[in-house]
Structures are given as structure tokens and as C-alpha cells.
Amino acid sequence: MGARASVLSGKKLDSWEKIRLRPGGNKKYRLKHLVWASRELEKFTLNPGLLETAEGCQQILGQLQPALQTGTEELRSLYNTVAVLYCVHQRIDVKDTKEALNKIEEMQNKNKQRTQQAAANTGSSQNYPIVQNAQGQPVHQALSPRTLNAWVKVVEDKAFSPEVIPMFSALSEGATPQDLNMMLNVVGGHQAAMQMLKDTINEEAAEWDRLHPVHAGPIPPGQMREPRGSDIAGTTSTVQEQIGWMTGNPPIPVGDIYRRWIILGLNKIVRMYSPVSILDIRQGPKEPFRDYVDRFFKTLRAEQATQDVKNWMTETLLVQNANPDCKSILRALGPGATLEEMMTACQGVGGPGHKARVLAEAMSQVQQTSIMMQRGNFRGPRRIKCFNCGKEGHLAKNCRAPRKKGCWKCGKEGHQMKDCTERQANFLGKIWPSNKGRPGNFPQSRPEPTAPPAEIFGMGEKMTSPAKQELKDREQTPLVSLKSLFGNDPLSQ
């Protein structure tokens, strides 16, 4: 404890033990608070020896302050303790922790105003990563570990998907070739992809050397040499030379040129990691239109084509590769429809509501077809009539009226319409009276006589005259038989 408590001694220790923890409270700071602060700094991988000086306390405050909004109570207590200790080192008279925090805030505001005033006096902004020093000279500021960590995390999570390219562009804005090489070197995996990227960079560097040959003769005094392809790639140039080219008059943006080469190589890598062609993106039968559009544009980002070609793909393939339901809707909108109009029109296609509507339309068409098939003598469609209620326009199976009892044809009970014999005709067109025996198109059950009647031989009966016999034959209706129909048919003999 002695080594940890040796941060303060003498008058500084007396001043430390007079400061209260809270305004109006009884508890005051003791040596145990210094011991606790040293242990907490070790947990945050900070050097406890920084507590011995005011500059060290200021560095600790700068590291802890960004995490105060989301930090724990222990982190806030550590920040408060270091703030009070800084006031003790600077011999700033404070009575409690709150007053010390106010002093720290005032000091930070003054420093911020001084920095802004200095930037205004120099007349130039401090653009990252090349900033102006106190003498107004451009100096290089290396990429922060947070930026490098964000880049590595994107590569590990996305595995060179299309969104890696805009992320790289955002993180490498204004970077020097040395910064760009650092971003490429921190990528641990995907070495095959990184080798492809190096090959692309070498090809572009060779093309640069071919288009920008070296001028013969010595370099004039005060001027810089022209950058070669390897200089732009950062392999044969120093940071000072890169800054000189980027800030010269006229400037040579070696950082932007190198970044453009890297993006070109990343496009090839993304194309390799995304083997699906835009021509293969088709909407599934039950896939929502929104998900289909998301897959379409994600694949479109990986296509190696100009913006005009991508616009043509969007206007043509987006409609052409949609499912039949969405395609009919999109074609009805016309060629000038926007994506918002397409998304709105196809919203809900494939869902329960759309399925029910399509099923209802299909059933309506089937019912209409069955109605059209009910024709009279093939003269055209006619209105159907319900056998239950007698009204036109619907069938008996769809009738809402109470079910009618008995036969729908004759109105009598005891049988159904299919068994009704009321005015039923045979194929000869003759009405079959159900109460007069069998129909005439059936073979007659009465056998034909083989001998003449008894009246002819005069067995006690009186002979009838031919006139009376003819009148009797006229009154008696002849029976219809198949024999009378077919005449001398040999099969009927």
C-alpha cells in the first residue's frame, strides 16, 4: 500500500484529505481512495504511475471522458477521483468533488477555444490525416486503432460483400498511401483475396508508369520528383514525400489515386465472392416483392458495369424476373413507374389477402364458364333458373331460400326430380303415360296367336261385317312396336 499511496505527500496530501466527497457531506478523501484508483486503472490497462503528475492525470481524464455516458458507476467514480487529484497537483483550491469537476470543465472549454482560435489564425483547416502543426507545417497523423478495428470487423463479418467497398471509401477518406497499406496489412484472413488485390495494384502501377514516363535530366532545385507507380503504392516513397505530393502546388493526389486502385481490386474480389449473376435473380412464387428487390439490388451492386447499364438492368430485369402476379401488376403500371410505385403496387402480393382474392376470381370464372355452357339448342347463352325458388340468375345449390320439399318438377312429394315420370318421353318423341302399362318401345309381353280366331270358324259367334271390323280397328289405337318401326329388317324375323 505504501507504493500506491506515495502519489501524494506533504502539503498535497493535506490538501487531498481536506476535500469532501460530496457537497455538504462529512466524508473526505483518504489514502485508500488513491489505492483504489490505482487498482482500477490497472483494470482499464492504464499506467497507475500517471497519477503522480498533473499531465498524467490530464491524459487519464482524456481517456475516460468519452466513456462516461455509457460507463458504469465505478468508471464515473474513477473519473471524479482523478479530477480531484489533478486539482491537487495544479494547486487549485476546491472544497468538494463537484467543484473540482466544474474546474476541469472550465479548463477544457478554454483549451477548446484556444485550438479553434489557432486554426482560424492559420487560415487553414486541419484535415485528417494531414494536419497542421504549431508552426503551420503539414504533418501526418496516423490512423486511429478504432478506425483500423472497424475496418477489420467489416471484413470479418461481411467477407467482401458489396457493402465492404463503401465502408472502405468512408474509412480511407483523405488517407495517405501509408495509411492505406496499413489498412490492408491488418486484414489477417482472406489471403487469396488480398493476393488478388496486390496483383491489381501492380497492374495499375505498371499502367501508370507507361502513361507517365520519367523526364530526362536533373530535377530543378526546390521541386519534387514525379511519383512512380511504386511511389503511389507506398513501397518506394516516404511519408514526407507523400505529404509533399498531396500538398504541393499543383498537388498530386497520390492517396486518392492509390485508393482508386484498391477499390478497383475490391470490385474484382466482391465479384468473385458473389458468383450469382443479376440474370439469375428471380422472384419466387410466394416471395414478397420487397425481399426480391433487396436481393436484386444487392447483386446489382456487385456487377462490374457502368451506371447506365445498371439503370437499364433495373428497368428491364426487375420486371422481367418477377413472378407472374407481380409482373402483371408492374406491366399495368407502365415503363415510367418509379420503384416506390412498384413497391406500393406489389405490397401484399403472395400474402393471405392476395391469395383469397385470386381464389375468389378463379372461382368466379369457373362458375361463369359453367353458366355459359348451359345453352338452349346451342343458340347462345341463356339465363339459368333455380328449381328451388323459381327465380333466375342462380342455381339451386346456391339458393338461399328454404329448401323446397318434394319433386322440383311436378311438385309432388314422395320422390325426387331425377325419379319423376311426369310427361317423360321416349326416344320416339311419344309421351309415356305411366298409368297405361309399359312404353311402346319395349317388346310386347303378349304373344302373337298362331291360329286364326275362333270367330272365323263359326264357333257359336256371329261373323262381323268388313265395315264394322274396319271401324273397330280405327277406334282401337295400334300398339307401337319395334317390328313396325324397322319393317322388313332381317334381324327382327
Swiss-Prot record:
GO cellular component: host cell nucleus; host cell plasma membrane; host multivesicular body; membrane; viral nucleocapsid; virion membrane
Residues that bear Phosphoserine: S144
Residue ranges of the region described as Interaction with host AP3D1: 12-19
Position of sequence motif Nuclear export signal: 16-22
Motif Nuclear localization signal: chain residues: 26-32
Region (Dimerization/Multimerization of capsid protein p24): 273-359
Lipid anchor positions (N-myristoyl glycine): G2
Residues where Asymmetric dimethylarginine is found: R382, R403
Segments of this protein annotated with the region PPIA/CYPA-binding loop: 213-221
Residue ranges of the region described as Disordered: 108-130, 433-493
Zinc finger (CCHC-type): 384-401, 405-422
Protein name: Gag polyprotein
